[in-house]
Amino acid sequence: MFDRYGGDNKTKLPDLEKMYLDEDGTCGIPVLNIFSLLSAENTPSVAKRFYGKQGRDVAQGVKSFCNIEATEGTDPMFAPLNDETGKPWLSTDGRIKIMNHVARLPKGIPNPKSRPMIPSGWTCTFRFDLQQNVLLNEATLKAMIEQGGILGIGTFRPIFGRYSVEWIK
């Protein structure tokens, strides 16, 4: 499920433009969103949720010593989402559904939301390179990537955006 930021708090994007798209209209996940999932300090990232007092150091290890790249597509900073047959998801695909619901803000104000959702079965691939350092080791990074699947990626987590990891050497 996607809810891409439009650039300011007043801009309301059309539903299908809330997805992350490349210049060809292929849906995908920006590499920066993976960094955020693993190490953000202002949202429930893996480092914050699973690593307690060590979370800051682990997050710093990800940000300072880990390189993440998409392994498919033309832009190493954007990982195309593929369907179960390996075809890229395009924003024009009729299988993409618009989900409508009401979010409740802390003061109880109803906030109607409308977000595009790609059905389960999507795949994307990333390459993770970790430099030797004292803050983060390979085993912890692998665990963090897998724990990210519990939190989920995108919005309305962890109900949506959960994933599992398949390691490729």
Predicted regions and their residues:
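RNA-interacting cores
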Residues: 1-169
